[in-house]
């Protein structure tokens, strides 16, 4: 069998293709990287610390690519991003220590998998419900909202409630938002803890938290989330690499595929209404939750076929949602060109 980077050619092609799909999701949603990569590596039989550490290293590389594109679109709040980094750093170290402690007890793999099932399932249900109910207030003009002041009617009720608690010091953010520093640091620590424990960038929790809890406009929430993930992913992957938890034969082909996908996904935020895709993203989270649960059942009952089913679910969910992003982008581009062609001279 031909081997490249120490892995088989088929596995290499799988990683490159998977990286492409995840890059699209990462650039478009500001999330969608390691919360799919880490479970996939666990399903493929990699040790917990390698799955977590390699997931973080992948997140770091992909977030750099996507952040550069969002910076060009003016969708990064640097003040908010720097404050998030402060709380995230401590959370990552705490999460890493928990993983290493659980490994000494032989419980890391099972507990990480169960946590994934609960988090992905819960957030997936919430996002899907919000999308079906249409509570996001309609379409999102990604370019227009980057610098415009936020309309109070577009801020989620829970974010309005949180903003009403004026616990000093208060921080002014883009879009005319003012929120307590302690809320920002609290969200950052919680997502940092998840980054270190689960090997995720925290984006699948941080981006919704920035929007639903703090009231940051969706485009800025995505761009700022990615900016923060550059640092959380970098710090996390460095800490794991120091303890032999990063496998470059995994990370390199994933990054090769994601480089193109992340640029495309980031560009798509300026032309595609996220509400059109949100329900599919919620279903993808639910698919990931079911996939990890099936893997655990396969391990418990010693049924390898369930591991295969789990991997197919993870890859299939990524393919479905990234495909919808590409399809919606093409539809919007065609619609825009059609409108230009009928505009009178």
Go through each PLM region and give its residues.
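Small-residue-rich hydrophobic segments that form or flank transmembrane alpha-helices
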Residues: 2-104, 110-115, 119-121, 125-132, ...
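Serine/threonine-rich low-complexity intrinsically disordered regions
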Residues: 8, 141, 151, 156, ...
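Transmembrane alpha-helices
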Residues: 115-122, 299-345
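Flexible cytoplasmic inter-helical loops of multi-pass small-molecule transporters
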Residues: 133-162
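A contiguous, mid-protein "functional segment" used to position or interact
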Residues: 267-313
